[in-house]
Amino acid sequence: MLLKQTKIVASISDRRCDVDFIKQLFEAGMNVVRMNTAHASREGFEALIANVRAVSNRIAILMDTKGPEVRTTANAEPIPYKIGEKVKIVGNPDLETTRECIAVSYPNFVSDLNIGGTILIDDGDLELEVIDKTDGYLLCEVKNDATLGSRKSVNVPGVRINLPSLTEKDRNNILYAIEKDIDFIAHSFVRNRQDVLDIREILDAHNSDIKIIAKIENQEGVDNIDEILEVADGVMVARGDLGIEVPQERIPGIQRVLIRKCILAKKPGIVATQMLHTMINNPRPTRAEVTDIANAIYYRTDALMLSGETAYGKYPVEAVKTMTKVAAQAEKDKLEENDIRIPLDENSNDVTAFLAKQAVKATSKLKIRAIITDSYSGRTARNLAAFRGKYPVLAICYKEKTMRHLALSYGVEAIYMPELANGQQYYFAALRRLLKEGRLQPSDMVGYLSSGKAGTKTSFLEINVVEDALKHAEETVLPNNNRYL
């Protein structure tokens, strides 16, 4: 069974992606590998993808896009600034940044900003205030001592930057993700539903089933979360840029609201950024970091993400092991009365959601060891995950891709099994496999949600003891198109 029910996403660099390293992370509790397109070459991606697939077909791969971001241009060497100094800013991606003039990648940067605005560079390390504006440049005052490196992030809190959702590099990377059959695309700086639909249009044109995770990194994304969740397949609370774009004291509350909305939408939510930041250089986390992980789980997140901790940190395997141990304990300690109650829409006639809720409720009344579902698209398993049962969901998947698409869903252990039998015989084959692998015992009671046929909607819930289900398999017939139970 699962080491923990909360899933772990680990960022991996092409500079450290050998098979042994990935295997260690997987065995420590990693479920998804994140590839950052800002920091790797195409050759590096090739090696990373091949090595992940060599370790296990159960590890999902998530690719980041850059999205509508603004960066400074290159500068020959780091530039020191002192508080009170004046510096010009221009929007010219072809101009080199100098001490007197900082150039940024967005041509209309000057026109989008006003006097009195704040500009934060390099995740807020350098703060500037706009004190004058001309047609060609902004004159800014330096608000703190800092050193500026090359191609650093630029954030403008409270200002909408009118950049297109996708860069040309993003489009090329999406086509590459389709070619390599990547599992998830995490799109940066999602502001509204159209930003998601821009990616969906490309995927649909190539008949791709890649799932889209919307990274919420600014106030506009927070404000439009409901419409974003209508079209995205999940959400990442990207606390790094979000903590720059909105006041940092609001981050915990925003995190809680976004997780809740993901659960109500029955789509996975990921909490990211600085979960174990000190473990980049230290073998042990701070107490605050341990509490941060636990609180995200108490909020009922599906997944947690490690960034620099595993991409370039000194203790990557230890970081995953630490997160696994903290998650497992937090899952035991969380209070059931704080579970998010998902109302059933009486007008929707959503049989899948109704049966999923009853299956999870049954685990609190009966000694059910696990809930089993056969899964073609993963929808039933995601419904079960949303209700946050105490025991794992064993999703027996007809397709490998579905198995990996469930790698972000809380409490779901997805298992790929080709459709060797029809209808209920697939269920019996799954039970025999689970017994053989030691995941279940003959005396275990299980719940089973299915439609009886791959690709059709869930239509019944059965609760039975494993050995009884198999013993009477050829004797009992349900009124479900005469498929054997």
Report the location of each language-model feature.
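Non-catalytic helical/linker scaffolds that mediate oligomerization, partner binding
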Residues: 1-485
